[in-house]
């Protein structure tokens, strides 16, 4: 008879605990779905008050994750490709900014975009690797009357440290005579 009593006790325990555990599980699922709905509403720029069904929340999440996965496929693998991709994005942003400004000279915009395009073409050409790392570079400092050649260890007083950051600012003042010259936009 003791076995029957314990079985009924176990049976009663299961009868009470199973629905309680199921309620807790559903509460966890609903809480996570609510959090997911809020997060996805931010990501897809919708209001958080929209009435989404659970299936809608999951579908939007799956779509968003697929878009993220696709965008990561287009990320360049090496630093040169990454630099080129960033350069192209920056040039496109400059183009959009020039188009949106009302009183920009068309000739200026054309010249700037042509310059950026030429620099991009130079970037896309295969670069030569420098042959020797330890050899000093020759720097030619130009002035209105004469040019003087200095080694990389000596200073060049005619070059101003303040510039706009474009290589064209210093082209007449500074010429680096080394094989595999590389242009940098900074």
Swiss-Prot record:
CDD domains recorded: bHLH-O_ESMB_like
Places the protein is found: Nucleus
Keywords: Developmental protein, Differentiation, DNA-binding, Neurogenesis, Nucleus, Repressor, Transcription, Transcription regulation
Primary localisation category: nucleus
SMART domains: HLH, ORANGE
Span of the annotated motif WRPW motif: 183-186
Location of the Orange domain: 83-116
Sections of the chain in a coiled coil: none
bHLH domain: residues covered: 13-68
Gene Ontology biological process terms from the UniProt entry: cell differentiation; negative regulation of transcription by RNA polymerase II; nervous system development; regulation of neurogenesis
Gene Ontology cellular-component annotations: nucleus
GO molecular function, one term: transcription corepressor binding
Domains: entry comment: The orange domain and the basic helix-loop-helix motif mediate repression of specific transcriptional activators, such as basic helix-loop-helix protein dimers. The C-terminal WRPW motif is a transcriptional repression domain necessary for the interaction with Groucho, a transcriptional corepressor recruited to specific target DNA by Hairy-related proteins.
Function (record text): Participates in the control of cell fate choice by uncommitted neuroectodermal cells in the embryo. Transcriptional repressor. Binds DNA on N-box motifs: 5'-CACNAG-3'.
Assembly notes: Transcription repression requires formation of a complex with a corepressor protein (Groucho). Forms homodimers.
Protein name: Enhancer of split m7 protein
């Amino acid at each position: 008879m003791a076995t029957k009593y314990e079985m009924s006790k176990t049976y009663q325990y299961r009868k009470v605990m199973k629905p309680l555990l199921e309620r807790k599980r559903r509460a966890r699922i609903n809480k996570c779905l609510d959090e997911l709905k809020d997060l996805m509403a931010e990501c897809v720029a919708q209001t958080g008050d929209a009435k989404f069904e659970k299936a809608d929340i999951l579908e939007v999440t799956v779509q968003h994750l697929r878009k993220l996965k696709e965008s990561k496929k287009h990320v360049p693998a090496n630093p040169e490709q990454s630099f080129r991709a960033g350069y192209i994005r920056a040039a496109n942003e400059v183009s959009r900014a020039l188009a949106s400004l009302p009183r920009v000279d068309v000739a200026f915009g054309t010249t700037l975009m042509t310059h950026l395009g030429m620099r991009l073409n130079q970037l896309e050409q295969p670069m030569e690797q420098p042959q020797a790392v330890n050899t000093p570079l020759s720097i030619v400092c130009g002035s209105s009357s004469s040019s003087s050649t200095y080694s990389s260890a000596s200073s060049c007083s005619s070059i101003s440290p303040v510039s706009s950051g474009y290589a064209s600012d210093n082209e007449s003042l500074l010429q680096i005579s080394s094989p595999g010259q590389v242009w940098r936009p900074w």
